[in-house]
Amino acid sequence: MNSQLVGILLSALLGVALGHRTRCYDCGGGPSNSCKQTVITCGEGERCGFLDRKPQPSSEQAKQPSATLSHHYPACVATHHCNQVAIESVGDVTFTTQKNCCFGDLCNSAVASSVTPLCILAAAVTTLAWLLPGL
C-alpha cells in the first residue's frame, strides 16, 4: 500500500479515535464579568455560544420605563438550540433568552484561542507530505 495513503488513513483514524469535543468559556449561568478563566468541555451535540437573557417588562413596568437588566454570558449551547429565542417564566417574571453559537474551541470570548486541535495538525502534516513527496 502506498505510504501516502497509509498516512492519510492513520490521520483519519487518529482524528476519529481521539474525537474532539469543543472547549468553551462558561459562567455557570451568571453574568460574564471575570468568568473567562472558566473553561469547560462541551458535551456531544453542543457548541460554544452566548446566552443573552433579559426580563420582559410587565404591564406596570411598561407604564414606567426604566433600565432593564440584561445578562450576556458564554456557555455551551445544544446545537439544535443555536440562534433560537426561548421564553421562560420564573415566578411572575418572564425572560427572553437568545442562544447564539460560534465555531471552534474557545470561540465565545474576545480572546482568540491559540490551541490547534491535534486532528487538524495531523491532517495538515499529512496533506503537506502528500503534496510534497520529497519529504
Swiss-Prot record:
The answer to whether keyword Transport applies is no
Q: What protein is this chain from? A: Lymphocyte antigen 6 complex locus protein G6d
Tell me the tissue specificity: Expressed in embryonic tissue and adult lung, kidney, brain, liver and spleen.
Q: Where is the signal peptide?
A: 1-19
Q: Which PANTHER family match?
A: LYMPHOCYTE ANTIGEN 6 COMPLEX LOCUS PROTEIN G6D, LYMPHOCYTE ANTIGEN 6 COMPLEX LOCUS PROTEIN G6F
The UPAR/Ly6 domain, residue ranges: 22-121
Propeptide found at 109-135
The record, for InterPro entries, names: LY6_UPA_recep-like, LY6G6d/LY6G6f, Snake_toxin-like_sf
Keywords assigned by UniProt? Cell membrane, Cell projection, Disulfide bond, Glycoprotein, GPI-anchor, Lipoprotein, Membrane, Signal
Quote the subunit structure annotation. Homodimer.
The cysteines covalently paired via disulfide bonds are C24-C48, C27-C35, C42-C76, C82-C101, C102-C107
Q: Which GO terms describe its molecular function?
A: acetylcholine receptor inhibitor activity; identical protein binding
